[in-house]
C-alpha cells in the first residue's frame, strides 16, 4: 500500500477543490460497485483508491459515467411515479369528500 500525497494528485488536477470533488465522486462510484478500480485494491478503502487513481494519472471522470446516468434516469422515473401516485391519492380523497 503506497502512500498518496496531495502533491502527487495535484500534478493531475487543477487545484485542491477539484481534487476533493473528483476523488469523492470516484470513491462513491467505487463503493457502489459501478466500476472496477484502475489500480490494485491492496485492501484500500474507496477514497484511498480514488486518490491513488488520480495520482497515477487516470482520468477518473470518465469511468462510471454510464452508471451514474442510469442512476439519474432511474431516480427521475421513481419521482415521476411517486408524483402520479400522490396525485391519484389526492383525487380519490377529494372525490370522497
Swiss-Prot record:
UniProt keyword annotations, A-Z: DNA-directed RNA polymerase, Nucleotidyltransferase, Transcription, Transferase
Alphabetical list of SMART domains matching this protein: RNA_pol_Rpb6
Catalysis performed (reactions): RNA(n) + a ribonucleoside 5'-triphosphate = RNA(n+1) + diphosphate
SUPFAM superfamilies according to UniProt: RPB6/omega subunit-like
Taxonomic superkingdom: Bacteria
UniProt keyword Nucleotidyltransferase, yes or no: yes
Gene Ontology terms: cellular component: DNA-directed RNA polymerase complex
Pfam families in the record: RNA_pol_Rpb6
Statement: the UniProt record of this protein carries the keyword Magnesium: no
Residues annotated as signal peptide: none
Transmembrane annotation, as ranges: none
This enzyme's EC code(s): 2.7.7.6
GO molecular function, a single term: DNA-directed RNA polymerase activity
GO biological process, one term: DNA-templated transcription
Coiled coil: none
Quaternary state and interactors: The RNAP catalytic core consists of 2 alpha, 1 beta, 1 beta' and 1 omega subunit. When a sigma factor is associated with the core the holoenzyme is formed, which can initiate transcription.
Its job: Promotes RNA polymerase assembly. Latches the N- and C-terminal regions of the beta' subunit thereby facilitating its interaction with the beta and alpha subunits.
Similarity comment text for this entry: Belongs to the RNA polymerase subunit omega family.
Protein name listed in UniProt: DNA-directed RNA polymerase subunit omega
Species classification: Bacteria, Pseudomonadati, Pseudomonadota, Gammaproteobacteria, Legionellales
Gene that specifies this protein: rpoZ
Amino acid at each position: 500500500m503506497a502512500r498518496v500525497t496531495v502533491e502527487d494528485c495535484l500534478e493531475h488536477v487543477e487545484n485542491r477543490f477539484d481534487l476533493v470533488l473528483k476523488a469523492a465522486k470516484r470513491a462513491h462510484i467505487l463503493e457502489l460497485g459501478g466500476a472496477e478500480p484502475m489500480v490494485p485494491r491492496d485492501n484500500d478503502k474507496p477514497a484511498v483508491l480514488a486518490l491513488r487513481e488520480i495520482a497515477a494519472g487516470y482520468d477518473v471522470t470518465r469511468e462510471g459515467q454510464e452508471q451514474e446516468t442510469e442512476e439519474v434516469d432511474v431516480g427521475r422515473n421513481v419521482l415521476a411515479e411517486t408524483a402520479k401516485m400522490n396525485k391519484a391519492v389526492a383525487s380519490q380523497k377529494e372525490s370522497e369528500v
